[in-house]
């Protein structure tokens, strides 16, 4: 009787072992599956939360053809933060200036919302190699060597595409800040975008204004022009912002390139005309000169710089022509950050000149950089 009563218990143990063993095997298999596939999917979702399985996910492993297919809509969705993006348009020779600008933006914690509009494929691949997803090319690609020469047709072709790029972003539903890359951020410009205006911009004048100057659109001068700079613009995705960009596009199209003109056309006069044509329909805000000075004021008027110490937000290296001259002036004023602070940029250290040594322009740029690094000249102290 005792033996018979123990058999069911023994059988029950065996049954439980078999069942538990099966469960353990299933759990082990599940852990193996999760261990292999979950990190891949999780890292993809963590790094690129704005992408979907049906869209192109930015990744350093993407092929050249993939980056060619990367669209503006995908790029803006990837980089946007709080429905806002910061954009610039860059050709390959100006990558060092892009890196310098990015370092200054990184110091203000806004680098992740930056989108580089590459004007040539070399720029597209280089930026996305270092910083996947943060560069997009909107065809057609431009000649990288002629696009950086101020006053050239290549430069005009580059800048004349700008309002259409900005309009496209606005129509996607995003606010956008545009910067030229020969700028340096010293403070956070978003702190100065007060109110609910459609467009914010900076003056390009060297004449000193009072600290409490008007923030309205400047009136036309006696010659019928104003000097608002198209180098730094913030636009909200409003009907007014879109209208301003559409009008700017129309004004540029009305002044096609003509090499015989005494003053070759560029985008800034067209922007000023667009501002005045839409003055009754677009709410605009002129940023304070003390915070957003032109290069003609900041680099040439030491007295004014000292009087406005601590107020400067973005410095524009304009009122000077030439790649090497711009770099030299940044170096003289301790605003060339690339040599000593490259690791603060999302792009890190860029080795780009060796790739251009097969061209005459590439060799010239290499000589410029070597010369500037060897002889920095006397440095001015920042106020």
Curated annotation (Swiss-Prot):
One CC-aspect GO term: Golgi membrane
EC number of the protein: 2.4.2.-
Glycan attachment residues as annotated in the record: 50, 82, 157, 212, 258, 301, 306, 357, 364
Transmembrane segments: 21-41
Primary location recorded for the protein, binned into one broad class: Golgi
Required cofactor names: Mn(2+); Mg(2+)
Location in the cell: Golgi apparatus membrane
Motif DXD motif, residue range(s) on this chain: 180-182
Domain notes: The conserved DXD motif is involved in enzyme activity.
Protein task: Catalyzes the transfer of D-xylose from UDP-alpha-D-xylose onto L-fucose. Probably involved in the biosynthesis of rhamnogalacturonan II (RG-II) through xylosylation of the internal fucose moiety of the A-chain of RG-II, a structurally complex pectic polysaccharide of the primary cell wall. RG-II is essential for the cell wall integrity of rapidly growing tissues such as roots and pollen tube growth and elongation.
Protein name (Swiss-Prot/TrEMBL): UDP-D-xylose:L-fucose alpha-1,3-D-xylosyltransferase 3
Organismal lineage: Eukaryota, Viridiplantae, Streptophyta, Embryophyta, Tracheophyta
């Amino acid at each position: 009787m005792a033996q018979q009563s123990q058999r069911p218990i023994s059988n029950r143990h065996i049954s439980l072992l078999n069942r538990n063993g099966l469960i353990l095997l299933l759990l082990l298999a599940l852990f193996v599956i999760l261990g292999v596939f979950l990190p891949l999917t999780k890292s993809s979702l963590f790094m690129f939360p704005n992408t979907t399985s049906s869209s192109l996910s930015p990744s350093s492993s993407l092929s050249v053809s993939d980056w060619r297919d990367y669209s503006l809509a995908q790029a803006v969705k990837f980089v946007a933060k709080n429905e806002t993006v910061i954009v610039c348009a860059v050709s390959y020779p100006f990558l060092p200036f892009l890196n310098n600008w990015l370092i200054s933006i990184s110091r203000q914690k806004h680098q992740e919302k930056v989108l580089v509009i590459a004007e040539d494929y070399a720029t597209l691949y280089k930026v996305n190699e270092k910083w996947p997803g943060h560069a997009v090319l909107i065809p057609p690609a431009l000649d990288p060597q002629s696009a950086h020469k101020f006053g050239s047709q290549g430069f005009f072709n580059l800048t004349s595409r700008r309002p259409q790029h900005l309009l496209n972003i606005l129509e996607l539903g995003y606010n956008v800040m545009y910067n030229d890359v020969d700028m340096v951020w010293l403070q956070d410009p978003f702190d100065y975008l007060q109110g609910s205006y459609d467009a914010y911009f900076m003056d390009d004048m060297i004449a000193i204004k009072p600290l409490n100057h008007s923030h309205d659109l400047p009136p036309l001068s006696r010659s019928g022009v104003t000097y608002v700079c198209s180098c730094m613009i913030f636009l909200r995705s409003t009907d007014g912002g879109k209208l301003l960009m559409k009008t700017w596009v129309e004004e540029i199209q009305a002044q096609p390139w003509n090499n015989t003109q005494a003053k070759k056309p560029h985008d800034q006069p067209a922007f000023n005309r667009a501002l005045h044509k839409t003055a009754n329909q677009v709410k605009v805000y002129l940023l304070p000169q003390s915070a957003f000075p032109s290069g003609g004021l900041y680099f040439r008027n030491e007295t004014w710089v000292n009087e406005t110490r601590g107020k400067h937000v973005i410095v524009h290296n304009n009122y000077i022509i030439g790649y090497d001259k711009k770099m030299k002036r940044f170096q003289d004023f301790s605003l060339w950050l690339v040599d000593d602070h490259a690791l603060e940029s999302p792009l890190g250290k860029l080795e780009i000149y060796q790739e251009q040594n097969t061209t005459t322009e590439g060799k010239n740029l290499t000589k410029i950089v070597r010369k500037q690094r060897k002889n920095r000249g006397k440095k001015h102290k920042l106020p």
